[in-house]
Amino acid sequence: MNPMRGAIGCLLGFLAANGCAGEEFFDRVESALSFSAREHQFRARVSGTVDLEAYHYRQVPPGLIYADGDTLFNPRLSLFLDAQYGAHFYAFAQARVDRGFDPSDQGGRMRFDEYALRFTSRGGIFNLQVGKFASVVGNWVPRHGSWENPFVTAPLPYENLVAVWDIAPARSTTQLLNWSHVRPNGLPGAEFTEKRLRSPIIWGPSYTLGASAFGEIGKWKYAVEVKNAGLSSHPEIWGSTEDRWRHPTVGSRIGYRPNPTWNFGISSSTGTYLRPTVAPTFSPGSSLNDHRQTVIASDLSFARHHLQVWAEVYHARFEIPTVADVETFAYYTEVKYKFTPQFFGSLRWNQQRFDRIPNGPLATRWGRNTWRIDVGPAYRFTPHMQLKLQYSFQRQNDAPRNDSHLFASQFVLRF
C-alpha cells in the first residue's frame, strides 16, 4: 500500500470514529488552546499543522530532498505559539517534530525553528523584532507554510543547489566545475554524496538569528534585517552564534502596493556564505569578508477574484577570490486559480541560468542551466483539512540524465 494513502486513510478514519471531522471539534480545540489574562490584556494561542508528505522520483532526489531509494514518506508536526501583551508587545515561536528541516529518511527529532519578540509602535509605522525568524527578502517566505503554499515544494531559487559549499571555498576553476558536475568525468554517486555540502541562492525561509525593523507608511512597506548567517546558509547553523556577529548578513526589502490588486517589492542581501570555522584555512590576507554572497531580487503579486499570481527574480553573486565572482540568475512565475470554493489548481514556471567563467582559453558555465515546470491541483475538504498533489518536470543542461520527474503529495491538517 502507498504509505501516503495509508496514513491519510488512518487519519481520516480516526477523525470519523471520534467525531472530529466536524467544525465543532476544531472550535473546541481552538478554545482549549487559547488563553487570556488581565482582562484580555494578555492573550496567547497555540496552533499547529500535521503534514503527511510523500515523494516519488527516479533519479538523484531533486531539490532539498535527502533520501536513498526512489520513494520517501515524510511526516511533520508543527506547533505555533502566538502571544500578545497590550497593543505593543508580541511574541511567537515555532517548534517542529520531523525528520529534519528538509524531507529526509533520517530519524525523527524536535527543534525550535522560530522564536522572537516584537515591539510595535502606535499605528504600526515602526516594528522592532529580535530572535530567530524568517528572512524579509522576497514574497514567497510569507506564504511558505504548508497551508498557504499551493505546492508541496519551494520555487527553484529556494531549493536548487549550486556549486558553492559553505565549509570551504573552491580553490580553483577546475574544483568549482567539479563541484558543479557540469563535466561528465565525476565519480559515480558523487553528486548525491556532495549534495549536503552545496547551497541554493536562498535556503527556504532562512530562519536565522538576528533583528529586524519593519513597518508600513501609506502604500509603502519597508524591512531591514541584520542576521547571523547568509541567505544560502544551511539550516543546521541558523541558530549558531559562534563568531557570527563579526560578519553579519544585512538584508532589506521595500514594497509598494498601489492598490489591493498589485504588490511590488525590491530586496537585497549581502553577507558571507562560509561558516566562520573555515577562516583559519585562508591564505594570509584573506578573510570571510572576501567570500560574500550578494543578492538583488524583485517580486510582484497580483490578486483579482479567483486568480492569484506571484513572481520573483533573483540575481546572486558569490565572490570566490581564487576563482572569480560567479553569478547566477533565477526566477519563477506562479499562478493559482480557484475553480470552486474548495478546489484550486496551480502552475509554476521556474528557470535558473549560470554565467560563464574563465577556464583556460575557453569560458565555461559554472552550473547547469535549469528549467522546471510544476503543476499542482489541491482540494480543501474543510477549513482545517486539505490535500495537495504535485508533478514536476525538470530539465538540466550538461546533466548525465537531462530530464527528471517528481511526484509529490501532501495532506495537511490545521488546528
Regions found by a protein language model. Give the residues of each.
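Cleavable N-terminal export/targeting peptides
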Residues: 1-24, 151, 156-162
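Outer membrane beta-barrel
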Residues: 32-56, 67-232, 246-251, 255-263, ...
